Curated annotation (Swiss-Prot):
The lineage of its organism: Eukaryota, Viridiplantae, Streptophyta, Embryophyta, Tracheophyta. Residues 196-217, 260-312 are annotated as: Disordered. It is found in: Endoplasmic reticulum; Protein storage vacuole. CDD domains: cupin_11S_legumin_C, cupin_11S_legumin_N. This is Glycinin G1. Disulfide bonds join C31-C64, C107-C317. GO terms for molecular function: nutrient reservoir activity.
Length: 495
């Protein structure tokens, strides 16, 4: 009973923390940016089953946005070891499919191994029970709250590529602004430790040698003594050494290869799961509704359990953790000649309200343009998934702080209120944009419903020193709201 009360208290406390999390303000002058660059990863850490690449979080644009960015590649049968971070995370699946799990303290283990028939003379083996496992596929956005441990596994031939950000400016991060990943197992190199030590300034030769040793990394369990681990887990010394990672090769790293594949209790795929859910909903609709105390009326399944629920289990332990915004999803903005945009905010993906983050997937056809626009209440971290685009960014002084190409695999950070416009240079430019607000808003400067379109004609005329007819053209010539087709397409449409 005491254990149950503790769990409920923890869940209530966690729910409150997640729900009211916000962001700290960047330090003074961190957003006084005169020049932006399209950045590629500058650190690469190879493991047995894949690799992890990171961008330097000490770069000024990352400091301004208050985020850290990394990219993980998992080969066939590769398992990314469980870890948690000091800030909330968003993970976008650029390629591949597989399974992942999260471990919420206080939530029940609902996946249970089937009971095996016991042979005569054999001792019974405890059934494996664990928390829920989820499928993921290309285009999925995965929400990971602060301090929640998660793992990921690739059970297909195609390598999994996952891009993720950590919000280090979140108020849930009670440490400094440096991203930190806490691994539960292994002796892998910490992907952000290098930058943490660089931030400390120049070191002596002795200090550099010590840094190289520290960069070898380790898990949180490797720091405890054998005696403590034996006592805590009730295991012998040999198992305790394995918990420390003492008997492990240095080349395994944060991503290990599971020989023969991972055998766990996992959910059906999306295709297998869709039809049973539809049939169950149809059965619920066909059942009669009970009124009053009619004992002969058959109540719908789950009605009794629903009446006993207190809401905690639904808001934390069973919340939806992934949401697809890729090419296969229904776009929020669509122009057949220009492209499409799909967003994920806390309005359609409630888990994001705990992270205070959101994301946007966009696809632009060749020479199509996303009109000049700005984020009212968020920084934008734009990662190019495919193709290339010409992008211009302007700051508050009217200076072009970026005027160049954003190519596949590179990232461009656009601070809040900086104005950005993009035009695709390839047949299909695709990007994902992480935003530091769960309900981001954008304002467009051109096209229908834009700022200039909403101004009175005479205000435009006198503001820009134009003739009346010219002001009217600015207001009415572009009928598109966000995405503008190539100019030749517009000319053909007018003709």
């Amino acid at each position: 009973m005491a254990k149950l009360v503790f769990s409920l208290c923890f869940l209530l406390f966690s729910g409150c923390c997640f729900a009211f999390s916000s962001r700290e303000q960047p330090q003074q002058n961190e957003c006084q940016i005169q020049k932006l660059n399209a950045l590629k990863p500058d650190n690469r850490i190879e493991s047995e089953g894949g690799l992890i690449e990171t961008w330097n979080p000490n770069n000024k644009p990352f400091q301004c946005a208050g985020v850290a960015l990394s990219r993980c590649t998992l080969n066939r049968n590769a398992l990314r070891r469980p870890s948690y971070t000091n800030g909330p995370q968003e993970i976008y699946i650029q390629q591949g499919k597989g399974i992942f799990g999260m471990i919420y303290p206080g939530c029940p283990s609902t996946f249970e191994e089937p009971q095996q028939p016991q042979q005569r003379g054999q001792s019974s083996r405890p059934q494996d029970r664990h928390q829920k496992i989820y499928n993921f596929r290309e285009g999925d956005l995965i929400a990971v709250p602060t301090g929640v441990a998660w793992w990921m596994y690739n059970n297909e031939d195609t390598p999994v590529v996952a891009v993720s950000i950590i919000d280090t400016n979140s108020l849930e991060n009670q440490l400094d602004q440096m991203p930190r990943r806490f691994y539960l197992a292994g002796n892998q190199e910490q992907e952000f430790l290098k930058y943490q030590q660089e931030q400390g300034g120049h070191q002596s030769q002795k200090g550099k040698h010590q840094q190289e040793e520290e960069n070898e990394g380790g898990s949180i369990l490797s720091g405890f003594t054998l005696e403590f681990l034996e006592h805590a887990f009730s295991v012998d010394k040999q198992i305790a050494k394995n918990l420390q990672g003492e008997n492990e090769g240095e080349d395994k790293g944060a991503i290990v290869t599971v020989k023969g594949g991972l055998s766990v209790i996992k959910p059906p795929t999306d295709e297998q799961q869709q039809r049973p859910q539809e049939e169950e909903e149809e059965e619920e609709d066909e059942k009669p509704q009970c009124k009053g105390k009619d004992k002969h009326c058959q109540r719908p399944r789950g009605s009794q359990s629903k009446s006993r629920r207190n809401g905690i289990d639904e808001t934390i332990c069973t919340m939806r953790l992934r949401h697809n915004i890729g090419q296969t999803s229904s776009p929020d903005i669509y122009n057949p000649q220009a492209g499409s945009v799909t967003t994920a905010t806390s309005l359609d993906f409630p888990a994001l309200s705990w992270l205070r983050l959101s994301a946007e997937f966009g696809s632009l056809r060749k020479n199509a343009m996303f009109v000049p626009h700005y984020n009212l209440n968020a920084n934008s971290i734009i990662y190019a998934l495919n193709g290339r685009a010409l992008i211009q960014v302007v700051n508050c002084n009217g200076e072009r702080v970026f005027d160049g190409e954003l190519q596949e695999g590179r990232v461009l950070i656009v601070p809040q209120n900086f104005v950005v416009a993009a035009r695709s240079q390839s047949d299909n430019f695709e990007y994902v944009s992480f935003k530091t607000n769960d309900t981001p808003m954008i304002g467009t400067l051109a096209g229908a419903n834009s700022l200039l379109n909403a101004l009175p004609e005479e205000v435009i005329q006198h503001t820009f020193n134009l003739k009346s007819q010219q002001a009217r053209q600015i207001k009415n010539n572009n009928p598109f709201k966000f995405l503008v087709p190539p100019q030749e397409s517009q000319k053909r449409a007018v003709a």
